[in-house]
């Protein structure tokens, strides 16, 4: 079967096989070595030099074209308006389901883009930091919907992106701990006018309801100049999630500080059943209701197979 056959519904996209996409790298240099690539890889994600060369280097080349075009537009509009404005950062959104490999993709892009010439400043922020603290979610009865749109402090996230896009100095982003499964009190990442900002999260392409009064209602993706959606079939995502859960049971869950410490003693059978239950109760519902419907809003869609390797790419037509 043609690799693009299951992507026919991605119109208005141009769909490329892996080989076709890889050919668009042209002379883009490889700036990472094997050890650096391994350090960027998340648990159970597959990332090697060939994946970087065939998938991410063409992305890097495409992004360099978009960034250059945006810079030209910025200077042209500045001349048109007759004003001197701060240069706005180029913002890239990375979206997709839990366990699909968003963090790996975001880190690889950050590493590659930071080595462009001249060297731009490239920062990375995850939207996990903009989740409401657990105490707030518990009071609202939303702990079982953590990661759903309603579990985020959307005004804070929109305010952060607005400050970044307007060129403000030293903008703070809250820090989230995957160990404690909660916001770290009084700890922040400081973003100081980067050239490029990568924003990674499950719902970054989420749309809002249309206003009845015609007033503008901003959404996170309004601030993006380019967006990437990591895609995989649901049974594959579930398998990856279960595998990750089992791996964490044997590692991070053994830390007494871990929110999931109680799962460290589960047998393989018990841990698998628990992971599947969490997937079906929370992650599957979020995927079907909130994440997957945003896929057609992405600039670029990377479709992964069961081996974690990208087998086709869909690029939105201009």
Curated annotation (Swiss-Prot):
Its EC number is 2.7.1.33. ATP binds at residues 96-103. Gene3D superfamilies: P-loop containing nucleotide triphosphate hydrolases. It is an enzyme of class 2 (transferase). It catalyses: (R)-pantothenate + ATP = (R)-4'-phosphopantothenate + ADP + H(+). InterPro entries: P-loop_NTPase, PanK, PRK/URK. GO terms for cellular component: cytoplasm. One of its GO terms (molecular function) is ATP binding. It comes from Rhodopseudomonas palustris (strain TIE-1). One of its GO terms (biological process) is coenzyme A biosynthetic process. The keyword Transferase applies. This is Pantothenate kinase. It is found in: Cytoplasm. SUPFAM superfamilies: P-loop containing nucleoside triphosphate hydrolases (SSF52540). Coiled coil: none annotated. Belongs to the prokaryotic pantothenate kinase family. Keywords: ATP-binding, Coenzyme A biosynthesis, Cytoplasm, Kinase, Nucleotide-binding, Transferase. The lineage of its organism: Bacteria, Pseudomonadati, Pseudomonadota, Alphaproteobacteria, Hyphomicrobiales. Pathway: Cofactor biosynthesis; coenzyme A biosynthesis; CoA from (R)-pantothenate: step 1/5.
């Amino acid at each position: 079967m043609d690799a693009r056959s299951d992507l026919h519904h991605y119109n208005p996209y141009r769909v490329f096989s892996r080989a076709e996409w890889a050919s668009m790298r042209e002379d883009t240099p490889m700036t990472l070595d094997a050890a650096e690539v391994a350090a960027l890889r998340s648990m159970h994600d597959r990332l090697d030099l060939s994946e970087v060369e065939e998938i991410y280097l063409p992305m890097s080349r495409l992004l360099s074209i978009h960034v250059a075009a945006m810079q030209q537009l910025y200077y042209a509009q500045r001349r048109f308006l007759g004003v001197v404005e701060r240069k706005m950062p180029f913002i890239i959104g990375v979206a997709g389901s839990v366990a699909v490999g968003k963090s790996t993709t975001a880190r690889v892009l950050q590493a590659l883009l930071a080595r462009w010439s001249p060297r731009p400043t490239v920062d990375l922020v995850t939207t996990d930091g903009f989740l409401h603290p657990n105490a707030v979610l518990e009071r609202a009865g939303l702990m079982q919907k953590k990661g759903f749109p309603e579990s985020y402090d959307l005004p804070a996230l929109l305010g952060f992106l607005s400050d970044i896009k307007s060129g403000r100095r030293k903008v703070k982003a809250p820090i989230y701990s995957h160990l404690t499964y909660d916001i770290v009190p009084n700890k922040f990442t400081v973003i100081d006018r980067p050239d490029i900002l990568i924003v990674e999260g499950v719902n970054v392409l989420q749309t809002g309801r249309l206003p009845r009064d015609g007033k503008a209602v901003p959404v996170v993706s309004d601030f993006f100049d380019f967006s990437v959606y990591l895609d995989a079939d649901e049974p594959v995502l579930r398998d990856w999630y279960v595998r990750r859960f089992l791996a964490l049971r044997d590692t991070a869950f053994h830390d007494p500080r871990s929110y999931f410490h109680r799962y460290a003693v589960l047998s393989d059978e018990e841990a698998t059943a628990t992971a599947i239950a969490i997937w079906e109760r929370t992650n599957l519902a979020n995927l079907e209701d909130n994440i997957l419907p945003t896929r057609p809003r992405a600039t670029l869609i990377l479709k992964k197979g069961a081996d974690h390797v990208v087998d086709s790419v869909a690029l939105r037509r201009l």
